Regions:
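Sec-dependent signal peptide cleavage junction
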Residues: 19-26, 268-287
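Short, conserved aromatic-histidine micro-motifs
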Residues: 63-65, 246-253
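Serine-esterase "nucleophile elbow" of acetyl-processing enzymes
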Residues: 22-68, 83-91, 287
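Bacterial Sec-dependent signal peptides at the C-terminal "C-region" and cleavage site
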Residues: 3-4, 9-25
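Acidic/histidine-rich helix-loop elements
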Residues: 37-45, 67-76, 105-113
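Extended, non-catalytic scaffold segments that flank or surround catalytic motifs
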Residues: 12-13, 28, 148, 156
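Alpha-helical cap/lid subdomain in secreted, periplasmic
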Residues: 80-225, 229-249, 260-268, 279-286
């Protein structure tokens, strides 16, 4: 009897191990701007919130961060970055899309996108992802840090976040409302308490900004971790209404959350430059 129990237990363990090894990996692609993008070491402590995401998932989840500094939906598409991303997407994958900071920058004509074109670009992205049998996830842009003299929070995105919400509603797309969650987070932190989350660096602290900088758009590691956590918490909440998110939620882990690089920037840029010569020129203009 004892031998039979041992044999049965061994068989169960073997079956579980075999099943786990056969489990299909889940891929997440990130498309966005500098607030999401991976950063090279020279830019430290500037950090994109996309850098935190791999730590939230187990090894069954593979993340490719295609977000790049200075990109709007228009330039991300025109430089061939979107086509390159889509060429790597397969059925069952997920594509997280967060743009808006550069689209609404009227003072920067090289990246500005009209509201009408912004909405059309998001619709194109959603359509392209679905055509590959993958799941699009739209994110409203995270908030910049701005408070008035009375310590009231000031939104700077205008109607662009509402256009993301409109596309999500009209096309029945999963929406992660990063604007609302990040706004609530910054208001709770307050005028002074929120400084530590953004790229306020002293002279000599950052190689990229040797004279120092007060930047209320880009994140420090503390800010990236906070925004990454907001994304994951909302993802878990939204998954209650969207069962297609089950592969992501079931692969979340409870380990220590830390910063990481999903795919080295130079490696992914090399891959992309082999498919589109416009990428290098676009990279120079965005620096």
């Amino acid at each position: 009897m004892r031998n039979k129990i041992i044999i049965l237990a061994t068989a169960v363990v073997a079956l579980v191990t075999f099943t786990a090894s056969k489990q299909k990996s889940v891929k997440i692609f990130l498309a966005g701007d500098s607030t999401m993008a991976d950063k090279e070491e020279i830019a430290y402590p500037e950090t994109g919130w996309g850098q935190t995401l791999p730590s939230y998932f187990n090894d069954n989840v593979i993340i490719e961060n295609h977000a790049r500094n200075g990109r709007s939906t228009r330039t991300f598409i025109s430089e061939g970055r979107w086509d390159f991303l889509i060429s790597r997407v397969s059925k069952g994958d997920f594509v997280v899309i967060q743009f808006g900071h550069n689209d609404q920058s009227k003072k920067k004509a090289d990246r500005y996108t009209t509201p009408e074109q912004y909405k059309a670009n998001l619709e194109k992205m959603v359509s392209d992802v679905r055509a590959k049998g993958a799941t699009p996830i739209l994110c409203t842009p995270i908030e910049r840090r701005k408070f008035d003299k009375n310590d009231n929070f000031v939104d700077q995105h205008g109607n662009y976040p509402n256009l993301v919400r409109a596309v999500a509603k009209e096309k029945n797309v999963i929406l992660i409302d990063m604007q609302h969650s990040s706004m609530d987070f910054l208001i709770a932190a307050g005028t002074e308490g929120s400084i530590k989350y953004f790229l306020h660096v002293k002279p000599g602290e950052c190689k990229k900004h040797p004279d120092g900088k007060e930047d209320n758009t880009h994140l420090r590691p503390e800010g990236a971790l906070a925004i990454g956590n907001l994304f994951i918490e909302e993802l878990k909440e939204v998954s209650k209404q969207h069962k297609e998110l089950k592969p992501l939620v079931k692969n979340l882990n409870n380990g220590e959350i830390k910063l990481t690089y999903t795919i080295k920037i130079k490696e992914i840029e090399t891959l992309k430059s082999n498919t589109n010569n416009n990428l290098d020129e676009g990279e120079k203009q965005a620096k």
